[in-house]
Structures are given as C-alpha cells and as structure tokens.
Amino acid sequence: MFNVRDRAEHTRKRKIISHAFSPRSVAAFEPHMVDNLRRWVVQLDRIAASRPQLDEENFGRFNAMPWFSYLAFDIIGDLAFGSPFGMVNRGRDETQTQIVEGGAISYASAVEAINRRGEISSTLGLLPALRPWATYLPDPFFTKGVAAVENLTGIAVAAVASRLDAADKGIADSRNDILSRLLQAKDASGHPMGRDELIAEALTQLIAGSDTVSNTSCGIFYYILHGERNAPNTIVSRLQGELDRAIGCEADIVNYSQVKDLPFLRRCIDEAMRLHSTSAIGLPRLVADSSLGVEFDGFHFPPGTVLSVPSYTIHHMKEIWGDDVEDFKPDRWLNLTPRQKIAFNPFSYGPRACVGQNVAIMELQLIIGTLFHRYDFALYQPTMGFHEGFSKKPKECHAGIRLRNQN
C-alpha cells in the first residue's frame, strides 16, 4: 500500500488494511506486545544485575539502541507474521529468511537489511533513472542494498508461508494479530487479498512497524534522560510519580489501560517525537494532474510537481515553537497554538497518513511506561548521533540501568 501511486488502488488497499488497525483490533494486539515486553524485561534485569558492567552507583552499563531494535522487531514479527523473530531471547540481530518460497532457509540480519533498504530506497526514489542499473553498479552501497531488499522479502516469505499454508488447508487460526486481520479482510467486491499481495502487505508492516518504532522509542528514551540531565528533578521524577500512582509497585509490565490516559507520559512521548522526527526528510506528494496546481506562500506549483514537508524542519522552527525549540519541554504541550498543532506531523496527514499510528502509540506508551516504572537510568551518551536513510536512526545510546526501589 505504501508505494501505490494510483489513487483508486490505494483507496482499495487502505480500506482493506484499515480494518486490521481499528480500535477493536488494536486492543487485541496488547497481549502480544506484553509477552514480548516480558521477555525484554528479563534481559534488561540481567543487564542491570551484571556485575562486570556495574559502575560505582550500581548501574549496569549497556547500549540501549540494539535492545530497542530487538524488541520492536520481535513485536512486529509477532503481530505481522504470527511469532516473534527471537531477537530479544538471542540478544542479537538474526532471523530466518527464504529468498524463494519453498527454498532453503538461511539467516540474515533484519535490522541491517532494513537500514540498507532504507538507504537504497531513498536514493533510488530521488534518482529513479538509476533503478534499472542498481543491480549492476559495482558500488557496495548498491549491491548490498539490493541484497538487503531480497533478504527482507525472504524474511516475509519465510514468516508468512506457514500461516498461509494452514489457512489454505482450512486449519482454524485463533490468533488476533495483523496477519489474521489481513487474511479475513475483503475488498468492496468481497474478494480477499491474494497470496502475493498478503506477503507484500505483511512485508510493509515489517518495514513500517520495526525500524520506526525502535528509532522513535530510543529517541524518546534519550530525550527524557537528556531533558532530566539539563534540568534535574523536572522530568524523570514526575514521570515515575505519575506511573507509580497509576500502576503500583508490584507490576513488572504496565497495561495499556493503566498508561493510555497518563498526560505527562504522553507529553514526553510527543515532545520527543517532535525533537527526534523519525521520518525527517518528509514524504513526497505529487500535485495531481487533474488539479490546477497548488498555491503556497506566493509560489505556484503546477500539476506533476513533487512536494514534501520535511518533518524535522518544521518540528525545529523557532517561529513555530519558540526560542526554546531545541529544549525538551513536555509542558509546552499544555498550551499548543493552532499553528503548533498543525505543524506536528510525526505520522503525516491525509489519506496517506500512517495507518498503524494507533498501534505505534500503544507500543510506545507500553515501552516507555514499563521502562521508567521498573528502572532508574543514567545517561552516558553525551549527544545523540544519527544515521539518515529513509528514517532517522540513532547510532547508539549508552546508558546505565538498575532496578528501582519503589517502596
């Protein structure tokens, strides 16, 4: 659906897929998220107690970025394909791939494949004349990028095949996940998706729901701790206090019902999404041939013009957000101006806005809520470095972690 340019076909696909992200469907996804969070917490507890890594304040040192990736990939694997990739349990970036359906199973780095795919896709999207030649260019950027696209397709083929084979044999599917919703979905004529279309849409969910969530959750984690470092006792203590009042001390994993309406948690998430801007470059939009063009700020853009709104730029404009635009200030969200409300677009707008944004917000609230309810952190990362492809990825995020004493 993501790269369909025909409006009628995009509308058809979106109507089918939107059922998988209805409020009722999203609520059914929570148990899968919680199961993966529970496995993640076991690993974080181990890091927090790892004696060789403890510093003088009993924080276990770790690079948080890979662990956000492992969790996000396992959750989307569970939701889109029927089982997690197992990255959290293994503690490394590795999953099964099958380049040709029915062919040999091999192992590939899913996170690296997503990264390389994002780089080559954004490059070829801006330079489409290179697309037919990409496979033949001797530059490793292109050869590895093309291989990454094949590996990602193979991951989807390997993960989806067993579910589809079971459905073809009439075996009942009791799971409540994205793939089950896609299997049940029908278009306006009553026709379900074909096998190739299902694999393509499941792959789209993998791409859309893995890297973006891992990058954003790591960005939120960093900016909360960075904001606390710049203004001690103004961020983390408020967040933990709000979580403690809503959840209590005994829970290891938060429930969505406990965190979905917590105002300071949501302000922290929104403020960090503003500062981080995962889809920083802006998504391209074509001025329709059927229109007279677009007028904006005294400029005329004729039909056929490709436009985009770079989220990072508008999220960091002083004339919109004020002189403290680069500061992490969750309370700015208490009194947003109309212009600020329009300018904040982490999920884009209109018929091509992110169809899974409700799932993403639920996931972020569960992840950040669980982290700061269960642990104390120390931020060792001086500043956050980023690598930009299709999305804006934190390079690393070194921190200390220890279990909280909530009594």
Q: Model segments located where?
A:
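C-terminal helix/juxtamembrane-tail motif
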Residues: 392-407
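Cytochrome P450 I-helix active-site segment
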Residues: 34, 53, 58, 98, ...
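Short, small-residue alpha-helix embedded
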Residues: 212-228, 367
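Conserved, non-catalytic sequence blocks in retroelement Pol enzymes and Pol-derived host proteins
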Residues: 26, 168-170, 256-263, 354-356
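Cytochrome P450 heme-thiolate monooxygenase catalytic core
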Residues: 30-217, 238
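Conserved cytochrome P450 K-helix/beta-meander segment immediately N-terminal to the heme-binding cysteine loop
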Residues: 303, 309-337
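Cytochrome P450 heme-binding "Cys pocket" and the immediately downstream C-terminal segment
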Residues: 43-50, 229-235, 340, 357-394
